[in-house]
Amino acid sequence: MSELFWFEKYRPRSFEEVVDLEEVKARLREFVKAGNLPHLLFYGPPGTGKTTMALVLARELYGEYWRENTLELNASDERGIGVIRERVKEFARTAPVGKAPFKLVILDEADNMTSDAQQALRRIMEIYAQNTRFILLANYVSRIIDPIISRCAVFRFSPMPRHLMAERLREIARSEGVELKDDAIDLIYEISEGDMRKAINLLQVAAAVSKVVDANAVASAAAAVRPSDVLELFNLAMGGDLAKARDKLRELMYIKGVAGVDLIRVFQRELIRMQLDDDVKAEVAELLSEVDYRLTQGADEEIQLMYFLMKLGSIGKKIRVAPKKR
């Protein structure tokens, strides 16, 4: 197996290789065709293709000289706006290589910068606008100040649809000589929530153990809980069998290594699909929110989850003894 991270190994190198994001690709192609582009702001959840698209754009603009004409920075890694200013100044002082009229600065995690730092960034963008274009990458556009947004063409990136993720994972598995089961794809999608980088990394970790990757291999690789385990835990508690529910909880937490907060997340996701009356769902959802909050405040995971299971037992008992509707 190659030591290279599969996410990097299979990163698209051209617009044609990028799956999904058709509207984004169409607009960026127009910029490339015109030989010019404004400052850009790409925003959306992690793993939705922001960095990949920025690098593809650089390749399309500069061809073989894309590395010489592109500067990648991470706002979280740099030691303040002063360092970013100096690096951009040093980069922008030399002429672009080739025929391009400008160089490209890709700034990741721009939304992690303070408002003051973003104001300074805005001034940097203005100073070097003659021969430098910026692509800002952010998870949350709401954390970017308006003066920067108004100077950029803004593009929204969404999580990859399940069918496209499945298709891509199968392609990678075939290339690596891995047999990928359908239940593995289902679980990878559930865990990754459309984050393609996370999905490919999960596949690689699972494939490192076995060339046949099923849901069990994925769950083990991710230290993740399967929806079926959560449903079993839920049914045991709702049925009043708290002893077995406790044993199942401890198995998940201490043998399979599942974090309590991850259990709550899967409970929240699966609750929507459960065949329960709306008032029961609302009561369970409120209970999940209460436990989730306590966990974020540092409360003991096992105690809080046992409290949750006991409350489920009480809810189940009320349902069982409630008079039948005529």
Swiss-Prot record:
The keyword Cell wall biogenesis/degradation does not apply. It holds the Pfam family Rep_fac_C. It comes from the Archaea. SUPFAM superfamilies: P-loop containing nucleoside triphosphate hydrolases, post-AAA+ oligomerization domain-like. One of its GO terms (molecular function) is DNA clamp loader activity. GO terms for cellular component: DNA replication factor C complex. One of its GO terms (biological process) is DNA repair. Keywords: ATP-binding, DNA replication, Nucleotide-binding. SMART domains: AAA. ATP binds at residues 44-51. Part of the RFC clamp loader complex which loads the PCNA sliding clamp onto DNA. NCBIfam families: PRK00440.1. Heteromultimer composed of small subunits (RfcS) and large subunits (RfcL). HAMAP family: RfcS. This is Replication factor C small subunit.
